[in-house]
Amino acid sequence: MHLPAILPWGAADGFSKQMLLVILSVVIIATFFLLAARKQQLVPGKLQFAGEAAYGFVRNSIAKDIIGGKDFMKYVPLLFSLFFFILVNNIYGAIPLIQLPSFSHVGGAYVLAAIVYLTWIAIGVKKNGIKYFKLATVPTGVPVYILPIVIPIEIISNFLVRPVTHSLRLFATMLAGHLIVMIAGSGIEYLVMQENVLLKGTSVLVLVGAIAMYMLEALIMALQAYVFTLLTAIYIEGALHADSH
Amino acid sequence: MNQTIISAATEGTNPLVPNPWEMGVVLAGFAVLFYIVVKFVVPMFEKTFAERAEAIEGGIAKAEKAQAEASAALEEYKQQLTDARAEANRIREEARAEGAQILADLKEKAAAESARITAHAHAQIESERQAAVVSLRAEVGTLATTLASRIVGESLSDDARAARVVDRFLADLENQNAGAAK
């Protein structure tokens, strides 16, 4: 399901609104944080304070709390970029007239999940060598006769299912929210057009329900950005400390 | 909007099949954002955090140092005060002892001086009395002789005789005096 392209107008494959929004999100995030960080003072102004609070949230509440240790600073840029990239692209869905969460198109979610997938495998191999794959799939303290069952499960859950759920969770929630808002809007439009007054009146119920769904969607948009970043931090932490799991 | 849904539904495309162009845009956009974050945003924020932590910790360290210095100075002052008190006590004791010593010396000296003066006076009085006696003896003798010669009209110019007479007279006098004194 793709919106018509902007360039060339209406074509199936071309420069679409979704692509424009993705590029715009990069500009918004970079501009905001560069402005907030530009004039750094020990006692921050309003903009700097907002930037520091946002940066500190990812740095301390996600990276430091999950990864911890003295290594966590290495992964702050990735987590920070992921969180705000997904957050802004999701919030698009809650802004009137834009109303298109970029990740309701599955391609972007695949790309981000793939980046994270390759990153945590690379970290695990770099940290533990090639035996990382053994550490990640053979749990310690399990009786030998259960291992033939456990090892395939671990391989499937860690290396096959994990990136799929990571990407589809984001994509599906955004698409579902997008569809619900869109269907509610169309439904209201359809009901208002009816000749029957009683039927016309039910559009109010749909409107109330749509507003509630809109609030819920706005919450889920922020929440999914957090969940995606949190899971990334958990995967990285698991790869770093594979020997102690 | 109806049109969109209908077209989406009738299009029959699978929503799980990605558009490669969109993937490319997301990848490129994320790469640019990541580069900016790594290169500028994180270092700038971390620099501020570090500076702020240093400012706070530096302030605390400075305050602790000042506190330590102040208590050291207080200790020193207390020590000096104690020393000064002890010194003052010592000086006072010394002065007291010295004063007593000086007083005793002076008393001794005064006593000696007075004894000396007394002895000297005694000696002088004795010698003056002696001189007076001698001179009196001579004068009184002459006077008495002249008087007697006048009275008795007898020439008593013979000195030896006269002296004998006078001596006898004086001896009588002394004997009388001595008898009276007794």
UniProtKB/Swiss-Prot annotation, chain B:
Pfam family, one: ATP-synt_B
Keyword S-adenosyl-L-methionine applies: no
Regions crossing the membrane: 25-45
GO molecular function: proton-transporting ATP synthase activity, rotational mechanism; proton-transporting ATPase activity, rotational mechanism
UniProt main location, coarse: membrane
Protein's membrane topology: Single-pass membrane protein
Source taxon at top rank: Bacteria
Compartments, record wording: Cell membrane
Keywords: ATP synthesis, Cell membrane, CF(0), Hydrogen ion transport, Ion transport, Membrane, Transmembrane, Transmembrane helix, Transport
Subunit annotation: F-type ATPases have 2 components, F(1) - the catalytic core - and F(0) - the membrane proton channel. F(1) has five subunits: alpha(3), beta(3), gamma(1), delta(1), epsilon(1). F(0) has three main subunits: a(1), b(2) and c(10-14). The alpha and beta chains form an alternating ring which encloses part of the gamma chain. F(1) is attached to F(0) by a central stalk formed by the gamma and epsilon chains, while a peripheral stalk is formed by the delta and b chains.
Protein name as annotated: ATP synthase subunit b
Species this protein is from: Arthrobacter sp. (strain FB24)
Gene behind the chain: atpF
